[in-house]
Amino acid sequence: MLHTLHRSPWLTDFAALLRLLSEGDELLLLQDGVTAAVDGNRYLESLRNAPIKVYALNEDLIARGLTGQISNDIIPIDYTDFVRLTVKHTSQLAW
């Protein structure tokens, strides 16, 4: 399943998101959700421990001035890769 987090993790039921993640799921951080990718924040450690791959939309990282601040565990992607993820996952859940 593809999970997309478009809101700040501080304004989301992040605990519920973590509970619903399963091995093989993927999470895309976009819009204000990219703030979860910033190195040193409390949400990043939970994402590191989850059995998933985590991506962040590069355009949103740039727009928020975060490109130099994200964890190496987060995979920056462009819109083409975003489309590939949506094609790959028939089930999606937006947060």
Swiss-Prot record:
Keyword match Acetylation: no
Pfam families listed in its UniProt record: DsrH (PF04077)
Domain of life: Bacteria
A biological process term (GO) from this entry: tRNA wobble position uridine thiolation
Localisation per UniProt entry: Cytoplasm
Keyword 4Fe-4S in annotation: no
Biological role: Part of a sulfur-relay system required for 2-thiolation of 5-methylaminomethyl-2-thiouridine (mnm(5)s(2)U) at tRNA wobble positions.
Family from the record: Belongs to the DsrH/TusB family.
NCBIfam families on file: PRK13510.1, sulf_tusB_dsrH
Record text on subunit structure and interactions: Heterohexamer, formed by a dimer of trimers. The hexameric TusBCD complex contains 2 copies each of TusB, TusC and TusD. The TusBCD complex interacts with TusE.
Protein name: Protein TusB
Native species: Escherichia fergusonii (strain ATCC 35469 / DSM 13698 / CCUG 18766 / IAM 14443 / JCM 21226 / LMG 7866 / NBRC 102419 / NCTC 12128 / CDC 0568-73)
